[in-house]
Every structure is written in C-alpha cells, then in structure tokens.
From Swiss-Prot:
Monomer. It comes from Puccinia graminis f. sp. tritici (strain CRL 75-36-700-3 / race SCCL) (Black stem rust fungus). PROSITE patterns: SAM_MT_TRM5_TYW2. It is an enzyme of class 2 (transferase). This is tRNA (guanine(37)-N(1))-methyltransferase. It is found in: Mitochondrion matrix; Nucleus; Cytoplasm. One of its GO terms (molecular function) is tRNA methyltransferase activity.
Length: 510
C-alpha cells in the first residue's frame, strides 16, 4: 500500500492521511455520508480510511510531529444575524478577506544556507520547527543580502518553550536565535475555519458539509443559513480547486421525475458532470436527473448479487448506476428504462461511454408499463445477441423509486400469464432453476419494526403474503437513515410462481 501512495507524491502513508483529512474533511456529508473526495486519491470510504490510519499511526516509524493550525484573528467582525428574506443575502467581499490578515510573532534559527537541510532534518531540531499545513518552515533571511543565511521557523515566540536538547544543538553550532514574524492572510485558512469565524455567534453549526458530484458541490442549507448562502458558496469555491460549481438544494421536488430543484450559489452554471464509480463512467446533467452518490456502496452490493449472463430489468434506472455496473462488471444483460427523458439521454450516453451497446438496451416510459413489457420484450423481441440465441427470461427486477416503489409492485401480478400460450414459454419457466429476484427500495417510518411494516405493505399491493417464511431468498437490507424516524431499506425476494400466474391455472402447468 505504501509504495502505491508514495508514487503519487507523498513522503509516507501517514503524510498522505494528514493531507487527505486536511484537504477533504469538508467533503464529508453532514448527514452521514461516508465518502471522501480528494484530487489526489479520488473517492475513499471514510470508515476504511479511519481504520487504516489508526493502524498506521500506531507504527512508530511512521509517526510525524503533530501539525499546528493557527486560528483566524480574533478581531474579525462577525456578520449580523439576519432573518431570511429581510435583506439581500450577504456576499463575500474583498473587505471581508482583508480581515484575515495576521502577523504572528515567532522565533527563528539563522542557519547558513548550505547547511539548511542538515539542520532541518536533525531530529532534535525537527521537533521544535514550525509544522503547519501549507506553511514552510524555511524562509529567506531579510538581513542576508547575499542569501548566505536562511531562517528555520520555530513553533513558538518564547525561547523558554524551546526544548533544551534543541537549544543545545543550536549552541554547539553557534546558531543565532532571532525574532521574526509569520504573515498569514485569507489563503491560509480553510473553508470551515473561515465560515465559523464569520457567521453570527448564534449559529453554532457550521454549514461546511456538502456532497460532491463531479465538479459540483451540493449543499442542503437550513433556513437560518440562507442569508449567508452566497458567501458560503463563494468560500467553498475558492477553497476547493476541484469545485467549479456550488449549488443549494431547494425544497421543491419535481413531482414527475423526482429530481431536486437547485439554485446556483457560486461558480459556473455548468451542471453536466462526468465521474467514475466502480470502473464505470457516468455523464449527466445533475440539474435534470436524480443522482445520490451516498448510494454507491449499495449499488456495488446489489450488483455483486448478479451473475454472468443473467438478465436484469431496471425499470427506474436513472442515469444507470445499477445498469452500468451489472453490464460492465457482472457481464449481465440489462433492460434499462426511465420516465425522465433526461435520464434516458444520460443512459444512452453512459452506455456509449462504457461501450455496452450490446449488453444494455435503453428505453423510456412509465415504470409499471416497462415491468409489464419486460418479459414479452425478452421472450419475443430478443433484444440481445446471446451466445445460444435462445429467448431470455428475467433473473432480476430492480425497483428503485423509494418514495413510491411499493405502489408499482402490482405490475408483477400475473406477469407471466400473457405469454403462457407462447411456444416453449411454460417449458422454459419450468426448466429455469430459479424464479426472478425482486429488489425493491422503499422508505419506512416504523424504524423499530421495519420488516413487519414493509412486508405488510408489499403483501397488500401484491395480494400475496410476502415474508421470510413464505418466499425464497428473502432479505431485508438497511440502506441508510434518511431523516429522524425515516429509514431506507431494500427488500429482496424471489417472485412466487402463484404471483406470476395469479389469475390463471398456468402455475400448476408450469
């Protein structure tokens, strides 16, 4: 692991972790998002990173001196507390930036320039050096006109705070200790430090957490922070080189296509993003589709349940997080559809980007109709050129519209019956070792008894009892907490034969 990280330009694994945490902590979503997004490393699982860092930090050989952060000046004027809507939102100005200028008194060791590396790497001197991210511990000596001397900045303005062992080394080499100052300005401090120092004292939670989607930083600001939304956006934009656009989610949700309305806070009005996840490339207009990077782990988990050459029907495919993974990584055949024309356009684009034209068939339309059409399409239209060219039957149905997914499950009633007279269909169903798996994402407010609540609702719509004891391959998987007393789950089970032939006697014939 260390060789891989060092080759990216880091001196050691521990130095990398310091760099990652200091540069990326603002990219951790405030509602529990577990991904870190950094220019150096891409996406990292926060839990894995923390575990790895704890292990590595216990190794003495990799221990680094603790890094010091200078707080912003105490005399910065905080912004006034303004009820939303009473006055124009406050924006970042040059006058605000100027308040962050500060001169910090320090001591420095005046060292001959040819010996600077020798003294800087001396263990007794290193522990007394200034060690702060984005600050150099070596500066030119203003009193040395011929550059014969340089200054090693120490971490204190008081000589009695320098370790005796460090002073001894300086004395042995006749090194002068002199007063100097460290000039800091707006560029030194990180976004959360700036925002915390500027906001009114009454606002105690710092709204510096956001979701990264490509080059877009996506906020969900509470009402009390709206008067400062443009300032927050501008600070985030200036302090994160990878960010080109900062937006804030508006409460309004497009009722038909279920994507969030958003407003531009800072940067370019460019909402077309390109990103990589699990070896797949995605491009889409974030302002016109629904996409949640917090579900990346679940996308991977569900995809791992799909075997090579299985058939997947993704009726609410969005931009294709399930469809692309299933086809590219699992070598499955996928029918992907969505009601939103922008999602369909993104699906077609992503199929081309990942060179999956032969494995993913894209269409647009209502999810219920696409579920009902899927079996006929696979059996009669043969949309894929499979090795044995036989008609296909579905192995997986993915229903990912959590707010209303369960309402669509009536589409599975009698799903197979229309093809019962088609030549070879019943025999093919009989020969198949397993019936299709349904993967349905949904919300529940019964957080203490999710299984009872979800199974009851699913059973009522399907008019068949769905429970761990009545269906095969049952699983109820917690996905994430959405809000207090509201969780997201995935219910997975094998569709019962009596459901697929619910209005006929074909069940017994199959």
């Amino acid at each position: 692991m260390e060789e891989e990280l060092i080759c990216r330009g880091f001196d050691s694994v521990e130095v990398l972790f310091v760099d990652v945490f200091e540069k990326s902590r603002l990219s951790v979503g405030g509602d529990g998002e577990r991904m870190l997004q950094t220019p150096q490393t891409g996406s990292l699982m926060l839990s894995s990173l923390l575990t790895t860092r704890r292990t590595i930090s216990s190794m003495a050989a990799l221990q680094q001196p603790s890094r010091h952060r200078f707080p912003p000046p105490n005399n910065i004027q905080r912004l006034p507390l303004r009820p939303d809507g009473q006055q124009e939102p406050i924006k970042l100005t040059e006058a605000i930036k100027q308040q962050f200028k500060q001169s910090i008194p320090l001591l420095a060791a005046r060292v001959p320039s040819p010996s600077i590396t020798k003294f800087k790497t001396n263990p007794e001197i290193r522990k007394a050096l200034l060690n702060s991210k984005n600050l150099r511990s070596v500066e030119p000596d203003p009193d040395s006109t011929d550059n014969a001397f340089k200054l090693l900045l120490l971490n204190t303005p008081h000589k009695d705070q320098i370790p005796e062992s460090t002073l001894k080394v300086f004395q042995e080499h006749d090194i002068q200790i002199k007063n100097t100052k460290l000039d800091l300005d707006w560029e030194y401090w990180m976004a959360d430090e700036i925002i915390e120092r500027l906001l009114p004292d009454q606002l105690t939670d710092i709204p510096a957490s956001f979701t990264m989607i490509g080059h877009i930083a996506h906020f969900n600001l509470r009402d009390e922070y709206l008067p400062y939304k443009y300032l927050i956006g501008q600070v985030i934009l200036e302090k994160n080189l990878a960010i080109k656009t900062v937006v804030n989610k508006i409460d309004n949700i497009n009722s038909q296509f279920r994507f969030f309305e958003m407003e531009l806070l800072a940067g370019e009005p460019d909402y077309t993003v390109t990103l990589w996840q699990s070896g797949c490339r995605y491009r889409f207009d974030f302002s016109k589709v629904y996409y949640n990077p917090r579900l990346s782990t679940e996308h991977d988990l569900l995809s791992s349940m799909i075997e090579k050459d299985e058939v997947v029907v993704d009726a609410f495919a969005g931009v294709g997080p399930f469809a692309m993974r299933a086809a590219a990584n699992r070598k499955a055949w996928v029918l992907a559809s969505d009601l939103n024309p922008a999602s369909v356009e993104a699906l077609e684009t992503n199929v081309r980007l990942n060179k999956l034209q032969g494995r993913v068939a894209v269409s647009g339309g209502d999810g219920r109709e696409k579920i009902r059409e899927a079996v006929r399409t696979l059996w009669l239209d043969k949309p894929f050129k499979t090795p044995n060219s036989s008609p296909l039957l579905p192995d997986h149905f993915i229903i990912n519209l959590p707010d209303s997914s369960i309402q669509f499950l009536d589409a599975f009633r009698d799903l197979y019956h229309p093809l019962s007279d088609s030549e070879g269909f019943l025999n093919a169903v009989k020969k198949k070792s397993r019936l299709p798996l349904l993967h349905c994402y949904c919300f529940t407010k019964q957080v203490d008894e999710p299984e009872s609540d979800i199974c009851q609702r699913v059973s009522e719509v399907m008019k068949v009892e769905i429970s761990p004891s009545t269906v095969a391959r049952f699983e109820l998987k917690f996905v994430r907490a959405v809000a207090p007393h509201k969780d997201m789950y995935r219910i997975t089970f094998e569709l019962p034969l009596k459901l697929l032939f619910s209005s006929s006697s074909e069940e017994s014939r199959a």
